[in-house]
C-alpha cells in the first residue's frame, strides 16, 4: 500500500475504533481479537501494559485497571496504578498506541498520522490533551474533529443532494446533538448542544443501584462496601442493558458474588425492559432538551430536518430510538453501525487531508462567544458563538491611563454583556508599551481558533511591535449545563445587562472627559480666563459627584455640558490628541489595564 494512510480514530469513553480510507472506501480495522471495537481500558500486571479486551477482563480482579479515562482528559487529575501516578494523556496514549500497532500489523506498513474525534463540547484543554495523547503514542494528529460532525461525514459520503441532518450521539460517557447543512460536498455545522457528563455508563449505574438495593433486601448484604462485588455488578449491568435492547426481560445470574454471614451469595434476579426504562427515564429526558436547543440555535424546526442519524452504542436502546422518533417526527437512520460511524468519519477526514478524497469540505463551529474584558468591566466580543472555524478576528484597543506601559488582556467566554458574568478563560500581560497619553497607543488583539477548535489570543503594540500570545487551556470542563446556563442567563438578563453596560460606558466616558478637560486647562495655562476656569472646575466637581452617586441620567446630561465647554478650547484637539468623536471611539476600545 504505497499511498499515505491517515488513521481515523474514535477515542471513546468505553470503546475505541480505528478506521482507514482505501481509495474512497472507509474500512474499520479489526483488533487482534477479531473485534472492530476495542475497550478503552488499560491494566498493569507484572510490569506489563495490557490494553483492550484483555484489560477489560481484569476489571474485577486487578486493582491496577483503569477505565473511562476520557472523563479526566483536560484536567489536572491523575490516576494511580502500578505504584505510579499517571496523567490522563498517558493512559489515553497507551490506548492509541495499541490501536496504532495493530493497525500497522493489519496494513503491513508504518502509520504516523491520524485524525482523532472528540465530543463537540470538549474545551481547549480537553482538545489539547487529546492531541498530546496522540503525540505520546507516536502519532501526528492532523486534525481534531467533533464526533457528531464525523458521523455526518460518514453518513454523507455518497450524498450529493442538499439536506439538513441532525446527529444524535449518545456514547458511553458523553452526549452530543449537532445540526448540519450538507450541500455539494460541504458539511457545515449549524449548531451543537449536549452534555459531557451523560452516557451509557449512567444507564449501567442505574441498574447497579437497583441491583444493590435488591441484594440488600433479598440477601441482607451491602454490596456498596465491596469493591470486587461492585465491579461484577457493573459488568452484569452493562450486559443486562445490552440484552434488554433485544429482549423484554433478562435474567441476571451472578454466582458467588460475595460471602455473607449466611454463606455465599448467588444472585438470581430478573429485570423487565419496562422497569429498566422507568428507572432511567430521567436520563433519557436529559437528552431531549439539547435536541430542542440545537434546532433553535440553527433556526430550524423538526420539520426542516431531512435525516436523523443515531450514533453511539447506547442509541440501540429502544426507548432512545422511540424518544428521538417522537421528538423529531421521523424514523432515525440506523443504516450505519452506531459504534463505528464516528471512526469512519474521522478516516474520511483523514482521506481528505491525505488527498485521497477531494469533494468534501468540513466546516465546524465554535459553541460560545469569545472576547475580552474592557474598561468598566464590559465584555467586548470578538468571535460570536456558532462562528464557522477556523476563524481569526482582530480589533484595536488602547490604554486607559497616561504613560501606561503594561496592559492585562482578560479572555472571556459567554453571552453576557458584562465580563464578570461570563467564564474567565485566562489572562496575560503585554509589557513594554511606549509611555504616551491615554488612548494614544494602538494595541491589536487577535483571536485565532484553529480547525481543532483550539483558541490562541495575541496582543501586539502596533508601534513597538512587541507581542504576547496565550493558548487557552482550561483546567475544568465546560459542561452542557454551563453552556445552556450562559445562553439562558444572557437572554433573561438582556435588559438588565444592557443597562449595566450603558452605566459602565457612561462612567468611563465621563472619567475620560474629566481627564481631558483637566489637561486642556493645564495646556491653556494663563490663557484661560478666570470665569472659564471657575465654570470648568464646577462642572468637573458636579460630574465627579454624579459618578460617585451613579446617577446615570443626570450624568449623561452633564456630559453634554462638558462637551460643549470643551469647544471653547480651539486648539484642544492637537494638544490633548482627542476630539469628542475620537474620545467616544477610543473608550469603546479601551482594554482593561494594569497601571504601574
From Swiss-Prot:
Keyword Protein transport included in the entry's annotation: no
Gene Ontology terms, MF aspect: ATP binding; ATP-dependent protein folding chaperone; unfolded protein binding
Keywords tagged on the record: ATP-binding, Chaperone, Nucleotide-binding, Phosphoprotein, Stress response
Induction cue: By stress conditions e.g. heat shock.
Pfam families for the chain: HSP70
UniProt keyword Chloroplast, yes or no: no
Region (Disordered): 576-596
Described purpose of this protein according to its UniProt entry: Acts as a chaperone.
Entry's family note: Belongs to the heat shock protein 70 family.
Listed name of the protein: Chaperone protein DnaK
Amino acid at each position: 500500500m504505497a499511498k499515505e494512510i491517515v488513521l481515523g480514530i474514535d477515542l471513546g469513553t468505553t470503546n475505541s475504533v480505528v478506521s482507514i480510507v482505501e481509495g474512497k472506501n472507509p474500512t474499520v480495522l479489526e483488533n487482534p481479537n477479531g473485534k472492530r471495537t476495542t475497550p478503552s481500558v488499560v491494566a498493569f500486571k507484572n510490569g506489563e501494559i495490557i490494553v483492550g479486551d484483555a484489560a477489560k477482563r481484569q476489571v474485577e480482579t486487578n486493582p491496577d485497571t483503569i477505565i473511562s479515562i476520557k472523563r479526566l482528559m483536560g484536567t489536572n487529575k491523575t490516576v494511580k496504578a502500578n505504584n505510579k501516578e499517571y496523567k490522563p494523556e498517558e493512559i489515553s496514549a497507551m490506548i492509541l498506541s495499541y490501536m496504532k500497532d495493530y493497525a500497522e500489523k493489519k496494513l503491513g506498513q508504518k502509520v504516523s498520522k491520524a485524525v482523532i474525534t472528540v465530543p463537540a463540547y470538549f474545551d481547549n484543554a480537553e482538545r489539547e490533551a487529546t492531541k498530546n495523547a496522540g503525540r505520546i503514542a507516536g502519532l501526528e494528529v492532523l486534525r481534531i474533529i467533533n464526533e457528531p460532525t464525523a458521523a455526518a461525514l460518514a453518513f454523507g459520503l455518497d450524498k450529493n443532494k442538499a439536506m439538513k441532518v441532525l446527529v444524535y450521539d449518545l456514547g458511553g460517557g458523553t452526549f452530543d446533538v449537532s445540526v448540519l447543512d450538507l450541500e455539494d460536498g460541504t458539511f457545515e455545522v449549524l449548531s451543537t448542544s449536549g452534555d459531557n457528563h451523560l452516557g451509557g455508563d449512567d444507564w449501567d449505574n442505574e441498574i447497579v443501584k437497583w441491583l444493590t438495593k435488591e441484594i440488600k433486601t433479598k440477601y441482607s448484604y451491602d454490596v456498596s462496601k465491596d469493591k470486587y462485588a461492585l465491579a461484577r455488578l457493573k459488568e452484569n449491568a452493562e450486559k443486562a442493558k445490552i440484552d434488554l435492547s433485544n429482549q423484554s426481560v433478562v435474567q441476571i445470574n451472578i454466582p458467588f458474588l460475595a460471602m455473607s454471614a449466611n454463606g455465599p451469595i448467588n444472585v438470581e434476579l430478573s429485570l423487565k425492559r419496562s422497569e429498566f426504562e422507568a428507572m432511567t427515564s430521567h436520563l433519557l429526558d436529559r437528552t431531549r432538551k439539547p435536541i430542542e436547543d440545537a434546532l433553535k440555535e440553527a433556526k430550524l424546526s423538526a420539520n426542516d430536518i431531512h435525516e436523523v442519524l443515531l450514533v453511539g452504542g447506547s442509541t440501540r436502546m429502544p426507548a432512545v430510538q422511540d424518544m428521538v422518533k417522537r421528538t423529531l417526527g421521523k424514523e432515525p437512520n440506523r443504516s450505519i453501525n452506531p459504534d463505528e460511524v464516528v471512526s469512519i468519519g474521522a478516516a474520511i477526514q483523514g482521506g481528505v487531508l491525505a488527498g485521497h478524497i477531494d469533494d468534501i469540505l468540513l466546516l465546524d463551529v465554535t459553541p460560545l462567544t469569545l472576547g475580552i474584558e474592557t474598561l468598566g468591566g464590559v465584555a467586548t466580543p470578538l468571535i460570536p458563538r456558532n462562528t464557522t472555524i477556523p476563524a481569526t478576528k482582530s480589533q484595536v484597543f488602547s490604554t486607559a491611563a497616561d504613560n501606561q506601559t503594561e496592559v492585562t488582556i482578560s479572555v472571556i467566554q459567554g453571552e453576557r454583556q458584562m465580563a464578570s458574568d461570563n467564564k474567565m478563560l485566562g489572562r496575560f500581560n503585554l509589557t513594554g508599551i511606549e509611555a504616551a497619553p491615554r488612548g494614544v497607543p494602538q494595541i491589536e488583539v487577535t483571536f485565532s481558533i484553529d480547525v481543532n477548535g483550539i483558541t490562541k489570543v495575541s496582543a501586539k503594540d502596533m508601534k513597538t511591535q512587541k507581542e504576547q500570545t496565550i493558548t487557552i487551556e482550561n483546567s475544568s470542563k465546560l459542561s452542557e449545563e454551563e453552556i445552556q446556563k450562559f445562553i439562558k442567563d444572557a437572554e433573561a438578563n438582556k435588559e438588565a445587562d444592557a443597562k449595566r453596560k450603558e452605566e459602565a460606558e457612561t462612567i468611563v466616558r465621563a472619567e475620560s472627559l474629566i481627564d481631558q478637560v483637566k489637561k486642556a486647562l493645564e495646556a491653556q495655562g494663563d490663557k484661560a480666563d478666570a470665569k472659564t476656569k471657575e465654570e470648568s472646575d464646577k462642572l468637573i466637581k458636579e460630574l465627579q459627584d454624579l459618578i460617585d452617586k451613579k446617577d446615570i441620567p443626570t450624568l449623561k446630561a452633564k456630559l453634554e455640558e462638558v462637551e460643549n465647554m470643551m469647544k471653547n478650547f480651539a486648539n484642544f484637539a492637537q494638544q490633548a490628541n482627542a476630539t469628542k468623536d475620537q474620545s467616544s471611539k477610543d473608550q469603546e476600545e479601551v482594554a482593561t489595564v494594569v497601571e504601574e
